[in-house]
Amino acid sequence: ATGEDGKDADSIKITQDENNVHFELTDGTVITISKTGQSADPNVIQFEDENVKKLCVAIWDTDGDHELSYDEAAKVTTLGATFKGNTEIQLFNELQHFTGLAALDDTFSGCSNLWRVTIPVNVETISTTTFNGCSQLKRVIFEKGSKLKLIAGSSGNNSKTGGTFSGTALTS
């Protein structure tokens, strides 16, 4: 398919869940369109990965609406072992809304199918085991204004030899 600008649209990834259709563009932008034609609640996080949503809602949905609001996410101060070893999750860009987090410990250790995550702006430290075993990890996005001070165990430009990002698919 060719778009209006004449560029190929074959590289657009289209996924869906029970409520929405998600279009991921080549630059990483995701456009979400409701299947019902109703606009989504602007106070509720629209998760790309249904597995991530299920885990988050099960633990941090404090008002019982089976959704996670931006306010509920912002109040989370630790993720604990919620995602550790989960081979189902693939995307977690919504992590950026968990602004109460200051550190990521072995949060995603063993998440072998996780390939993209967005780190919240207030995270100051990432441990050596945060992404241990994330062999499909290709993209880690740091928000503008990131307060990150330490990526433990990183060894300069050669972090593939050991440390936080060893064993991932990250190339730079």
What feature does the model see in each segment?
Residues 1-41, 117:
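Collagen/collagen-like triple-helix sequence repeat recognition
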Residues 41-55:
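Boundary/junction segments of secreted and surface-exposed precursor proteins
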Residues 82-86:
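Acidic, Ser/Thr
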Residues 61-72:
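Acidic, glycine-anchored loop motifs typical of Ca2+
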Residues 17, 53, 57-63:
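Short, solvent-exposed loop/edge segments of extracellular or virion-exposed proteins
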Residues 21-23, 52, 56, 95, ...:
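Extracellular/surface recognition and adhesion modules
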Residues 70, 74, 89-102, 112-125, ...:
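Structural signature of tandem-repeat unit edges
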